[in-house]
Amino acid sequence: MKIALIGFGKMGREIDSAAREQGEMITRVFEWDRTVTPEALADVDICIEFSTPDAVVQNIRAAVEARRDIVVGTTGWYQYLPEIKAVVKESGLLYSSNFSLGMNIFFRIVKQAAVLMNRSADYDPYIHEIHHRQKADSPSGTAVSLARILTENIDRKKETLAKPPDGKINPDTLHVTSTRAGFFPGTHTVGFDSESDSIDLRHTAKSRRGFALGALAAARWLRGRKGVYTMDDVDL
């Protein structure tokens, strides 16, 4: 594949390294100060986008106009999904809050657990995530995805609270908490607590390597497909 990397921070550099090791060609690199245009994508097969919430929608539009497939790892733009889905017709777009293959297996495990816990009102679910102190957003996009899985499958949880509570939390509220410290690539815990016992499900990333390999696997899967997809559609 001839790949354009849109965003060349820590994740972009990790993808660049993994792609070259796998024999893929990095033909374009767009750093933060370089505008992505359809013309600049003429000689690429696919884009892998890890930029910023402010830039991602315009970057997607450039890829769509150029009829180039795009894998998007940036979060914080999903409110624009309806209008993006309306214009992605002649190319493919795959987005995810986390491209780690292990995390996407974890998503499916959590969904199965949530379905079971929907029948067990004694258990109260919660989410806690830990990332390095330089991470800008809180909670993480992955934690938001996990919260969505729980609230969609546990009827007694109607809303999510992702900040310190002001007083008691309503029983129908799912609490999501965050820690920013040290150099953690990412640890996510989904817990279910009752008066009798506790169950913790945890995924711990050891490096960004898993995210990079997952993004490249997603790019290969996307080639030749049209429309909008998520990692739920990818055969793991």
Residue ranges of each PLM-predicted region?
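Short glycine-/small-residue-rich Rossmann-like dinucleotide-binding loops
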Residues: S51-T52, T75, R180
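C-terminal substrate-binding/catalytic lobe of Rossmann-fold NAD(P)-dependent oxidoreductases
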Residues: K2, K10-E39, A121-L236
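Rossmann-fold NAD(P)-binding glycine/threonine-rich loop
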Residues: R61, T74-Y95, N104-F106, Q112
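Rossmann-like NAD(P)H-binding beta-loop-alpha module
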Residues: I105-M117, D122, S138
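Short, acidic/turn-prone active-site loops that include or flank metal/cofactor-
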Residues: W32-T35, T75-Y78, N98-F99
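Rossmann-fold NAD(P) dinucleotide-binding segment
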Residues: I46, P53-G73, P82-I84
